[in-house]
Amino acid sequence: MSEYLTKGPVLINFWATWCSPCKKEMVFLDKFERQYKDNGLSILSISIDSQKSLSHVRSYIRANDYIYDIFLDPNRQVFKKLNGNLMPTNVLIDTDGKVIWRHYGYIPGVEKNMDIQLRSALKLNA
């Protein structure tokens, strides 16, 4: 994680292949990664799918050509450590390692608030 934080803020997204709202949100996460990566944003997408579902995770990511980094947390250790409770869960961490924003679940339109939070963390004009 520290290697990402040296570049800028990090948005950690917890998702699963069985979570339809997660998949809807991933489209916006990819857009944000493409839009803000040159400003220092890193998006780490962490699947809580089981080890048995690893092939589903890989094929889903390949099929959608997402550019952000994908990790696995099949035992949900990181998910629990960051107080995840609903899917999807998003946690925005500043360069000091402090959680500055957290969002649980997905509803259409949440991407606008997410964009505001990302721009603020990146110190970009609103």
Model-identified regions with their sequence ranges:
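Structural microenvironment flanking redox-active thiols in thiol-disulfide oxidoreductases
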Residues: 23-64, 74-81
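A short beta-strand-turn-helix
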Residues: 1-10
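Aromatic-flanked redox-active Cys/Sec active sites in thiol-based oxidoreductases
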Residues: 13-18
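Hydrophobic beta-strand anchors of alpha/beta hydrolase catalytic cores
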Residues: 11-12, 43, 90
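Proline-centered helix-kink/hinge sites
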Residues: 9, 21, 27-30, 69, ...
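Thiol/disulfide oxidoreductase modules built on the thioredoxin-like
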Residues: 6, 59-67, 73-119
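Non-globular targeting/processing and membrane-anchoring segments
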Residues: 124-126
